[in-house]
């Protein structure tokens, strides 16, 4: 987190202080004013987002009080911009208000953050965010008629509540994404409430909004995790690969200039500074649009849009066509006699340019794969440049790159083959076993979620023409969720090694993980007790949840048995459990003497 600059801009209104460089060109002035207007119009939403993300436990009523305080603050500063409090940056102002609200820090356990100042306080609030939101109640759902009545009665309060519920469940989603979600939901509510079949309309409109939020927040969390754990060089490498693939005709100097704005964007957005995040993302899009002729032919229509649609449009625009004169080979980095001298003169720039050059020539590859190839190239030159004839050594670099890609491609092909052969349910059990073996310390809900995400990635990608890049990119996001944002997150030694050793090779590392041998196995009685507790409880729970929970317990109990043995035990136990759950006295069914589960328990003990 030390890598984040943690700088901010003066707050919402704004009287312009020395900390904010004023634009001078007419087009820059227009852009600045448009961004400022957008921020001013969304003060309430931005306060809700920041407050709900920093203190997820806060009630809606408490957040509403903060919004009132913030709006009063805005009015005071508009009346007299010379007040000392009006020069605060966004995060400091919001965190001051959170800390000043009577009893709130003690009630929600963040008073330790309020005792700190400056960088340390911002860091503390950031680490107060919880990715696992299982402690929150289920997302509130209303009957469509009730929903429309609430929207009609007080649309502002209704939409604020929606923004609050979404933000607290997505603490690492960037403010522009959440504002887009709110705009889409408002549009959906307006349209659906005019229809006869409200439930159907809401269902149809909600699915793409949820998917949009999930996709972007997952990517943003993963990239911020890379910044926090591996530092700005890794963040820069990710962005070089992403932008070089999307805009293959961009020049290296133009890309370098653009990435300065992109890095500033991630500094603010990853920290959770809502105003800085909006300003810096707007600046990135303005930068791209001001040079669109030399960057991309696909974004002209996007650049004619206003905030926040412009950013969304550019992000979702198709990749530009690769220049016709651009071959697949990178002769500058494999055929030149001066490679070692150029590497030694300025290593960071040299490898950044290699990644740029290789990425724009191989737009079909995933971002993690491009980073792997760059690491392979670095290691190769480390060896070759110490030899008498370096050229004869690194001349075969392309072969090394192809070997790396072939290994990654084989992994994806195997996963897609499993998807086609097993189907979704069996494949989810496969990944559930795999994740539980590797990380049995994780709660069942998290293991199930990870396995679902992997299946969803394969279901999305395995029929596409860019199957490889799609699977590899999405699978890496799943591993990003497993590894988490906090660099101090610990699961077990082998998982921690994969999460921390090398960002690019995280996926191959996980692919070769064995069962965790440090985990203390539960007893046989614990397994049977877990099964009894599930099937004997009076509440009717989804059978799939019970099966998943039992499978997790089975893997933790007997990680070393074969897949065939595990499937046999899983089938017998769950069949017996379902049968026991349907009789009048299910507890008796689980006794050691019971013919339904007793034999299976003995079989399991033998397997162990």
Curated annotation (Swiss-Prot):
Region (Disordered): 585-608
Subcellular location field: Secreted
SMART domains recorded: ALBUMIN
Keyword Secreted attributed: yes
Superkingdom of source: Eukaryota
Residues carrying covalently attached carbohydrate according to the record: 33, 109, 153, 402, 488
Described function: Functions as a carrier for hydrophobic molecules in body fluids. Essential for the solubility and activity of lipidated Wnt family members, including WNT1, WNT2B, WNT3, WNT3A, WNT5A, WNT7A, WNT7B, WNT8, WNT9A, WNT9B, WNT10A and WNT10B. Binds vitamin E. May transport vitamin E in body fluids under conditions where the lipoprotein system is not sufficient. May be involved in the transport of vitamin E across the blood-brain barrier.
Descriptive protein name: Afamin
Organism: Rattus norvegicus (Rat)
């Amino acid at each position: 987190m030390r890598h984040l600059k943690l700088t901010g801009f003066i707050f919402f209104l704004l009287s312009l202080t020395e900390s904010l460089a004023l634009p001078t060109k007419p087009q820059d002035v227009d852009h600045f004013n448009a961004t400022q207007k957008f921020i001013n119009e969304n003060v309430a939403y931005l306060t809700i987002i920041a407050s709900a993300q920093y203190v997820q436990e806060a009630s809606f009523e408490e957040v509403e009080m903060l919004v009132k305080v913030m709006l009063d603050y805005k009015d005071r500063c508009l009346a007299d911009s010379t007040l000392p409090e009006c020069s605060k940056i966004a995060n400091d102002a919001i965190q001051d208000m959170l800390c000043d609200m009577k009893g709130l820090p003690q009630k929600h356990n963040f008073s330790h953050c309020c005792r700190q100042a400056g960088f340390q306080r911002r860091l503390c609030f950031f680490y107060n965010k919880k990715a696992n939101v299982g402690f929150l109640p289920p997302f509130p759902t209303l009957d469509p008629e009730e929903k429309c009545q609430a929207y009609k009665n007080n649309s502002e309060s209704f939409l604020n509540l929606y923004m609050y519920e979404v933000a607290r469940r997505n603490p690492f989603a960037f403010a522009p994404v959440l504002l887009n979600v709110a705009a889409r939901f408002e549009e959906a509510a307006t349209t659906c409430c005019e229809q006869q079949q409200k439930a159907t309309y809401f269902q149809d409109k909600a699915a793409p909004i949820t998917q949009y939020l999930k996709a972007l927040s997952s990517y943003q969390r993963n990239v911020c995790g890379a910044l926090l754990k591996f530092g700005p060089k890794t963040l820069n490498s990710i962005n070089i690969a992403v932008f070089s693939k999307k805009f293959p005709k961009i020049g290296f100097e133009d890309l370098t200039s653009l990435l300065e704005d992109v890095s500033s964007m991630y500094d603010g957005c990853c920290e959770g500074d809502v105003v800085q995040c909006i300003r810096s993302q707007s600046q990135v899009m303005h930068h791209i649009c001001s040079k669109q002729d030399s960057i991309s032919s696909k974004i002209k229509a996007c650049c004619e849009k206003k905030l926040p649609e412009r950013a969304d449009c550019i992000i979702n625009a198709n990749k530009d066509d690769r220049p016709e004169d651009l071959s697949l080979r990178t002769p500058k980095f494999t055929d030149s006699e001066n490679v070692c001298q150029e590497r030694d003169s300025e290593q960071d720039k040299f490898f950044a340019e290699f990644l740029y050059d290789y990425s724009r020539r191989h737009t079909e590859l995933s971002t993690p794969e491009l980073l792997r190839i760059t690491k392979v190239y670095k290691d190769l030159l480390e060896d070759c440049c110490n030899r008498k004839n370096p050229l004869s050594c690194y001349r075969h670099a392309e072969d090394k790159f192809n070997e790396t890609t072939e290994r990654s491609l084989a992994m994806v092909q195997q996963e897609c083959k499993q998807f086609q052969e097993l189907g979704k349910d069996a494949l989810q059990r496969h990944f559930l076993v795999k994740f539980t073996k590797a990380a049995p310390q994780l709660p069942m809900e998290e293991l199930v979620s990870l396995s679902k995400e992997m299946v969803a990635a394969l279901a999305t990608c395995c029929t596409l023409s860019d199957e490889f890049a799609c699977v590899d990119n999405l699978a890496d996001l799943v591993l990003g969720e497993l590894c988490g944002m906090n660099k101090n997150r610990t699961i077990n030694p082998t998982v921690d090694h994969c999460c921390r050793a090398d960002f690019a090779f995280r996926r191959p590392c996980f692919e070769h993980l064995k069962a965790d041998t440090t985990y203390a196995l539960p007893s046989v009685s614990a397994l049977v007790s877990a099964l009894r507790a599930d099937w004997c409880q009076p509440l009717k729970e989804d059978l799939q949840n019970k099966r998943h929970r039992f499978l997790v317990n089975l893997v933790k109990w007997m990680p070393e048995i074969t897949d065939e043995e595990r499937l046999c035990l899983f089938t017998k136990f769950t069949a017996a459990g379902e049968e026991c759950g349907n009789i009048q006295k299910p507890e008796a069914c689980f006794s050691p003497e019971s013919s339904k589960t007793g034999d299976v328990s003995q079989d399991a003990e033998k397997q162990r």
